[in-house]
C-alpha cells in the first residue's frame, strides 16, 4: 500500500535557500514572543484535533496516527500518545520557556540584552538565524525538543526521517494555520546527503541517527 509520495530535496536546494536564512529570524522578530507563544497553543489544538492540509490533500488526526504507524511500525495508540505529548508541550509553551530560561524576562530575549533581577547586565545574541534538525525515523517523540525554537524567534530547517515525515509536515500545517510565517520553517526530505548538508549549512544543529 502506498501511503504517500514524498518529493525529495537535494543539497543544492538547501544551499540556495540558506542564502536567505536570515529572513526566517527577521519575520519572527516582527512578532512579540508572547504572541508566538499563543500561536503555539493554537497550533497544538490544531495539530491534535483538526483536519489539516497535507500535500495536495488533507489529513485528519486519525489519518495521521494510522499513516505514522504504518510507516514507522509504532502502534497506533503510541502514535496518538505522542500526539497528546506534543499537544501538551505546545499548550504549556509559556511554562516551558520559563523553565528553560530559569525565569528570564522574555523581553530580554526580544531585545538581546537587559538586566537581571539582581541588577546584573546580561546579553543573549542568536548564533544562527535557524536551527537545523536532522530527525529520526523511529522516534516521533523527539519532536518536542524543537518546538520551543519558533517562540524564541529562531527559524527551523527540518530534515525529516525517511519513515517519519508525518510530524514535521503536520506541525508545519498547524503552525502556519495558527499564524506563524511560512518563511520561518523549511522542510527538506531526502536521504543521508540531505542530513549531511543540513549539518554543513546550518550554524546550529541537532542530529538524531545517521540520516
Which residues make up each language-model segment?
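Rossmann-like NAD(P) dinucleotide-binding subdomain of oxidoreductase/dehydrogenase enzymes
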Residues: 104-211
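N-terminal Rossmann-like NAD(P)+-binding subdomain of aldehyde/semialdehyde dehydrogenases
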Residues: 1-117
Amino acid at each position: 500500500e502506498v501511503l504517500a509520495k514524498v518529493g525529495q530535496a537535494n543539497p543544492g536546494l538547501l544551499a540556495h535557500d540558506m542564502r536567505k536564512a536570515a529572513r526566517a529570524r527577521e519575520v519572527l522578530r516582527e512578532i512579540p514572543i508572547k504572541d508566538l507563544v499563543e500561536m503555539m497553543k493554537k497550533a497544538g489544538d490544531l495539530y491534535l484535533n483538526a483536519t489539516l492540509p497535507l500535500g495536495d490533500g488533507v489529513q485528519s488526526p486519525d489519518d495521521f496516527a494510522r499513516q505514522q504507524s504504518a510507516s514507522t511500525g509504532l502502534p497506533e495508540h503510541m502514535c496518538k500518545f505522542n500526539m497528546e505529548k506534543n499537544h501538551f508541550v505546545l499548550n504549556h509553551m509559556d511554562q516551558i520557556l520559563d523553565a528553560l530560561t530559569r525565569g528570564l524576562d522574555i523581553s530580554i530575549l526580544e531585545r538581546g540584552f537587559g538586566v537581571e533581577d539582581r541588577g546584573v547586565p546580561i546579553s543573549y545574541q542568536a548564533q544562527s538565524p535557524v536551527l537545523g534538525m536532522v530527525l529520526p525515523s523511529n522516534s516521533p517523540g523527539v519532536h518536542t525538543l524543537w518546538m520551543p525554537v519558533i517562540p524564541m524567534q529562531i527559524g527551523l530547517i527540518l530534515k525529516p526521517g525517511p519513515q517519519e515525515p508525518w510530524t514535521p509536515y503536520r506541525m508545519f500545517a498547524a503552525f502556519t494555520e495558527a499564524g506563524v510565517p511560512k518563511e520561518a520553517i523549511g522542510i527538506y526530505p531526502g536521504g543521508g546527503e540531505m542530513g549531511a548538508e543540513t549539518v554543513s549549512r546550518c550554524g546550529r544543529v541537532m542530529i538524531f541517527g545517521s540520516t
